[in-house]
Amino acid sequence: MFTVRPAFSDVTFEGANNEIVILTGDIEAEEFDEILAEIKAKKPTQMILDSEGGNGHSARRLAKYVNDNNISTYISGVAKCRSACAIIFLAGKKRLCEGVLGIHQASLPKDIGNEEVNMNYALKYIQEDIGNLIELLNDFNTPSFVYPYMLKTTEMYNFSQEEIAQINTVKSLDEM
């Protein structure tokens, strides 16, 4: 078993061949490259998620890797996957949520999210960022009903069980 910090609060590999990676806690930019390198080296086939979110750009990088490498994503019945974590979950070609899945609209990063930022720059940044996110989510075959919640919800929106059933691509862990 291998644990790395702090890009996620906890990253653990399990299984005889490290086929399962468990990611819990906040998604941070610090040391993210090392964690992504470790995931690439161990080549897990399933990712278990439990995170309230964090750095969206780090999440997108991991999500792209998850999708490109056919890693299944899973949220257990006692887990939550919100905000940036949801992007990673949606990247799974085989994905199953039995817990809480939540999203909200994008916000400016801390380094440009202050009052002194030129409004035109901020608008351009947000539009480009949202465009890139939609393109990525389309690559993940994300159901279109997800987008209005992503664009209009200022606070966290937790999907209903009926909506999660439409987002899931498998019905049980046996199919993963």
Task: Enumerate the language-model features and the residues they cover.
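Bacterial N-terminal signal peptides
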Residues: 1-3
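STAS-typified acidic loop motif
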Residues: 7-34
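Terminal peptide-recognition signature
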Residues: 23, 47, 89, 164
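Sec/Tat-exported extracytoplasmic proteins
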Residues: 31, 39-43, 51, 66-70, ...
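Extracytoplasmic/secreted envelope proteins and their assembly/folding machinery
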Residues: 32-36, 59-63, 67, 85-86, ...
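Short, glycine-/small-residue-enriched flexible loop/hinge segments at domain edges that mediate gating
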Residues: 44-58, 72-79
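Glycine-rich beta-to-alpha active-site loop
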Residues: 67, 71-112
